[in-house]
Amino acid sequence: MEEVDSKDISSSKAEDCVPSGGECHEEAVDELMKEDEVGGEEETEQTKGIKRKAESILPRKNKQGRLSLEQEDEEDANKESGGGGSEKEDAATEQEKGVESEDARKKKEDEVLASSVNDAEPESKVPPSTPAKTGEETEETRSGEEQEKPKEMQEVKLTKSLVEEVRCDRQQGRSSGMTPEDEPPRSESSPCAPGQVKKTGTNASSKNEPAGAKWKGQPAVDASSDESKLRCCKEEYCIGTWNVRSMNPGKLDVVKQEMDRINIDILGISELKWTGMGELNSDDHYIYYCGQQSLRRNGVALIVNKRVQNAIIGCNLKNDRMISLRFQGKPFNLTVIQVFAPTPYAEEGEVYRFYEDLQHLLEITPKIDVLFIIGDWNAKVGSQEIPGITGRFGLGMQNEAGRRLIDFCHHNRLVIANTLFQQPSRRLYTWTSPDGRFRDQIDYIICRQRWRSSVQSAKTRPGADCGSDHKLLIAKFRLKLKIIPKTTRPFRGTNEADDTSEESKPSSEQKGKEKPQASVPSAVSSVPGGSGVTKEVGATSQEAKSVVKQNEKEEPQANVLSAVPSLPAGSGVF
């Protein structure tokens, strides 16, 4: 390298620094010389650094095959020239520094975005997408920095979109009541390639979840559906039917004990063989019965315990073969009909009248009510399954009465419940012949098809015994019954006899009408078939009115009350 003449370099500077007088002190000249030497040393250091960079660039360019021999000769000439190429190399270094500053700024932006992503999302175990740089790879990556710039811009855009997606997911999680802890764990996988961002949305996480898994914020059952509302408000009750073959006072006590032991809420009785119709209370058991007026034949009854008695809203004493009770329930009311069908050897007209009366009773029953028809049907439906009517767990062979019963169920959309549940044979048959050789299923619990799912089980209880050839048949169903509030009547005083005004006369006559009816069941007057009792009550009231009118003419009104209890016709009613 040629030596640079310091005099040529410093001549211009010395001329600039000469004072206006043309004289120069020796100290000033020494300082100028020192500054020139320091500047020369700095320039030599810069040129050395430029040469080193150029030497490192040359082998890299030779490897890539981008430089020819002529270019290498030119670079050698530039090294020898030194001064002219130094300015170009300075410009190159400044450009590299600018690129490095831009890279540093972009890295800072990426770090800020990554920190925001970490704040928005839980920490994941996925390793960073860019591998660590080693000392050998730095030289190769510098040449590809310009090519990686557009890729880095794509990564920045993707990270920004990822941050927006995470924010949207967080807002959706807050609106649904979820916390970051409730979010499903993210799946671990291999690091992503450069220029690609791993999607961590809900679609990717749902693939790794089990099929039946649900988040805490989502309900397991849709509470708004009608079926769920019905399911939540139901309670279990037990209903049963029993042919007792005549009910004497001793057998009634046995039946009540069995009801308490098995926890039966509603029990239907067939072949009661009581005369008349009405209701009575016996040891917290309420009995509604209906029989013939004179003959102790047939007869049906419904016995309820104290738990459901307050829910009764109606009673229909139809005839000696059927009776019904209606209970107030939630969400729908409950209607229970107890029947005693004619035997297969009965006349055809009697069987026809039975089904005609039962059809009329069904027509006046609200369609929306939960309906149960229980009793002794004297029919065999057989073990063959009929979809929608009978199940696979019947017993015996079908007979003519059984076919008639199946037609009746098909016409009214009814299902025989005790053929739907698999039970041992001793829990299926309901009647045993006197010699014990034959066992048949002739007692049934029937319900509407739409309420088939409310029945939990249906079977007989062989352990219950009241001296009958029939077994007790029970079924458990789910429904909620409501208690009806009692209505209190206004209290009537006893000073009506002292009142001599004309206004007291109608009240005394009305009182005379009410007293003979005190011991007669309230449901008798509204029951078809109870006409004999109503006629007797009407005749008694007419006689009481005539006696009261005669006493009013002869004596003061104070003697009206004394005349009413002495009626000969009223003694038979009390």
Swiss-Prot record:
GO MF terms, alphabetically ordered: catalytic activity
Gene3D superfamilies: Endonuclease/exonuclease/phosphatase
Keywords: Cytoplasm, Nucleus
Bias (Low complexity) ranges: 518-528
Compartment list: Cytoplasm; Nucleus
Coiled coil: none
Biased composition (Polar residues): 199-208
TM regions (residue ranges): none
InterPro entries the record matches: Endo/exonu/phosph_ase_sf, Endo/exonuclease/phosphatase, Swc5/CFDP1/2
Domain of life: Eukaryota
Annotated Gene Ontology cellular component terms: cytoplasm; nucleus
Compositionally skewed regions (Basic and acidic residues) per UniProt: 1-16, 23-37, 45-55, 86-111, 134-172, 502-516
Pfam families recorded: Exo_endo_phos
Region (Disordered): 1-222, 488-574
Region (Hydrophilic): 493-572
Other comment: Gene duplication of the ancestral BCNT gene leads to the h-type BCNT (CFDP1) gene and the p97BCNT (CFDP2) gene. The latter contains a region derived from the endonuclease domain of a retrotransposable element RTE-1. This repetitive sequence associated with the BCNT gene is specific to Ruminantia.
Name the record gives this protein: Craniofacial development protein 2
